[in-house]
């Protein structure tokens, strides 16, 4: 007995041709329908037909799932192509932005106008004509132009109708003196780096046509914050015209001037004689020196007067003014070239007597050792220098005659006096230990009431012939 397998659906699996989706579904439905009809006809005669129908159905579903997975993988590419071909286009085309600031472009179009003023609509039109970036439907740059016109003070609004300050149609002008020069240069952008010959490096020549650029001569902001240094040609008005001019700000004398009182402003001029520099012939004063100094009238201490105070303030000022004029002519470049010693002083430096030692206002360091109260100003404990003239605190009242006489020591009496030679050997250690602060060595040497001086002959033997003029 020969066994018969079902129809072609059982003997061979159904063949599905891969094609378009509609045709594949049509054939699949037809095969499924054909298998169902065969299964219903031969169910009784062949029980294996039911199994063949299930195999046919499962095979078709598997192939259909494979197709759907394949279609899913190909779907996004097909959708992207469809969207790209039928997508919405942009409503404007962007050109590369020019490598200049809005301030530079606005100032350039205003300065190149015939009347040097434009309205807002004219500015927008001129900028869009020069640069294609501002053409098309892109309108965002117009707000940037309005912002720059109202932000920078170099743009000035000229009212079309003064009675309507908020009206439209006003003109805009440029004040070239207020334009920041750093904003006129070409910016470092991708367009400017591609071809540097297309765009000008600086728009200043197109803006300052017929104008001078005053901002170039102005100093930088860090330099403008520094105080101006006084010069010989233009001294500041607050400066004393009679004070000596110093070339170096950090000179020692410039630091000393800040510590000295106003009455001793010309102290450095008076001590120039110690360096042995003679006065120029053209700066010698023709007027005789005044016998007394005006500053001595209000002085009660000998230490407030310089030991070299043999010249009045007025004479020194006159000499200083002459020295200034000669210094401007390029005669000398020394810090003390504006001053000269008085004509009656000798430039030859001899042995310094004790009363010519430096005081608290001199350039030299004064002794600052403080003596005990029992040793102050008694004149006896340290050295018996009775012949040295001394103006003490407990002496007689100073009269007008004391201020006329010795140029080096203006408080001596004007009459003839006898002079005794002081001892040549002096104990400087004991002298320095007993000197009060800000006082000279001479202030602590003599007694309070001794005003007798050595004879001229003995005094000349010690100090040489240069001091013979002290005898009256």
Curated annotation (Swiss-Prot):
| Molecular function GO terms recorded | DNA-binding transcription factor activity, RNA polymerase II-specific; DNA-binding transcription repressor activity, RNA polymerase II-specific; RNA polymerase II cis-regulatory region sequence-specific DNA binding; RNA polymerase II transcription regulatory region sequence-specific DNA binding; sequence-specific DNA binding; SMAD binding; transcription cis-regulatory region binding
| Bias-annotated ranges (Low complexity) | 294-310
| Sequence motif Fast/FoxH1 motif 2 (FM2), residues | 367-373
Query: Would you say which domain of life the source belongs to?
Result: Eukaryota
From the UniProt annotation, which stretches of this protein bind DNA?
A: 97-193
> What is one cellular component GO term in this UniProt entry?
nucleus
* Cell compartments where the protein resides: Nucleus
Q: List the disulfide bonds.
A: none
- Protein name as it appears in the record: Forkhead box protein H1
Query: Taxonomic lineage of this organism?
Result: Eukaryota, Metazoa, Chordata, Craniata, Vertebrata
Give me the gene this protein comes from: foxh1
